[in-house]
A protein has these predicted regions:
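Conserved, single-site charged/polar hotspot
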Residues: 1-251
Length: 251
């Protein structure tokens, strides 16, 4: 967010206290990915980028440390739909304006509906987006189905079924770019179809979604809530980058 916004006595003190400390995976510096809101469970690296899993970028339930929990299998479509339509507790499940103002730019604060959200696309708009983004004519769109989901419920392969052609897109960034003029909040969504015509073609699609961004690594809003609740920076880092270590490499 730039030096102007981030430079403050608090930031300067945080830099001083953590000088020389590096987040490590064995002898290698961690690839410390982050996104705005994981949606309750962080995503694994390989579902968003190269098929090379990283041991410290795995699925993590974003809830209080030490609380017993199970990690739902969100690669399963039935489990993913149940999770996305539900509003489970999580660090990043917050509408606290003070915390959000510390994490988000002004224009990003226009909505607090990012942990769970809805996006409506008309048949006409969906066809237009597909033509613009994919340079394809699939005909009228009949359905969109998840072919593969990651551990956070984010779709990594999406099948778009048209009257003329069926096409599969992925990974998550291509899906988000295709279904929005800019970027869909995330690819963790389920699709409801409405207003079918006489040919059975839906005239309206409602995407019910979870989270904001790719969801891999540190969840910015979750981390801000953890900080507000008194968690130390090392506990926050090791919550999101499980299996990593913080090492002092220089003074």
């Amino acid at each position: 967010q730039g030096i102007t916004k981030e430079t403050s006595p608090h930031v300067a003190e945080a830099i001083r206290q953590t000088k020389g400390q590096i987040l490590m995976d064995g002898e290698e510096i961690c690839d410390a990915r982050f996104s705005k809101c994981c949606g309750g469970i962080t995503e694994e690296f390989q579902y968003c980028w190269e098929d090379t899993p990283k041991t410290y970028l795995t699925a993590v339930r974003d809830i209080a440390l030490g609380v017993e929990h199970t990690l739902p299998n969100l690669t399963n479509e039935e489990e993913a739909e149940k999770w996305i339509r539900f509003n489970p507790p999580a660090f990043c499940n917050t509408q606290d304006k003070k915390i959000l103002s510390e994490v988000l730019n002004d224009y990003d604060q226009e909505t607090v509906n990012f942990y769970r959200w809805k996006e409506t696309l008309s048949q006409e708009k969906l066809q237009q987006l597909i033509a613009d983004k994919l340079k394809m004519d699939l005909g009228a769109i009949l359905d969109m189905k998840a072919v593969e989901r990651g551990k956070s419920g984010r779709i990594s392969k999406l099948q778009i079924i048209g009257t003329e052609k069926t096409f599969t897109i992925g990974k998550e960034l291509e899906i988000r770019r295709t279904l929005s003029d800019s970027h869909l909040l995330s690819s963790a969504f389920v699709v409801d179809k409405y207003d079918k015509d006489e040919q059975g073609v839906p005239q309206r699609f409602e995407l019910i979604g979870a989270g904001w961004g790719h969801g891999v690594g540190l969840c910015q809003i979750g981390a801000a809530v953890m900080g507000e609740q008194g968690y130390h920076y090392d506990a926050i880092l090791l919550h999101y980058y499980q299996g990593a270590e913080i090492k002092k490499l220089y003074k």
